Amino acid sequence: MKKNRRIVMPLLVFILVIGGWELYVRVFDISLYILPSPSKIISALIENFDVLMQHSLVTLEESILGLLISTFLAILISICMDLSKTFKTSIYPYLIVTQTVPIMVLGPLFSIWFGFDLLPKVLIVIFMCFFPIAISFTDALSQVSEKEINLLKSFGANLFQIYKIVKIPSGAIGLFSGLKVAATYCVGGAIVGEWLSSRAGLGYYMLRVKNGYMLDKVFACVLMIIFWSILLNLGVTLLEKILFPHLRKGERK
């Protein structure tokens, strides 16, 4: 019964919002360039699907590449911080400071320094995705039981074996929690980069149709962005279940 309610209630709210939106636009005859109706947005999505997919491929390349690089860097830095308290004390404050810098300030600088091709967009994605992964994984590594580590040491385990047997599997839940957040950020990061400097991508396409006051196409583009963000998040969840199936099962128990 509770499961049905969890599905039915959000679905009901969705139907009411979309229905009310459609009714409002039709009754008050709102212009397309001010607020398109949901039916117009769906029509624009279907009619421009091929174009949207072409731009999606560009955005996905930037997003996935940035996410992979930021994950690698976050894992590396997190392990270094876990190994050395001095290193953590030295670098942790700067990780916090990076999150206070507006991405709209860095974007133009990256474009000036690195041009208008793939690199500046990937750097923006890395900048947005690195922090949640690094912080979540670092915190998870620091919470590993000392008893388990000491037990392995008593059996003669070296540092590599301790990380392989205990620390990485135990810290994986933090790593994937950060990855799920980053997976939703990465598409947004690529879009911001494309707004600032690009020749293709969903951000570039959105800016172009927005300047032409084609708001139905703007909303269609937003739907594509939401779709890819959710898909990447689900991909990370699936990867977690494949690599560490015990994690969520252990939580439920």
Sequence positions of predicted segments:
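C-terminal transmembrane helix and the adjacent membrane-cytosol boundary/short C-terminal tail
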Residues: K85, S177, F219-K253
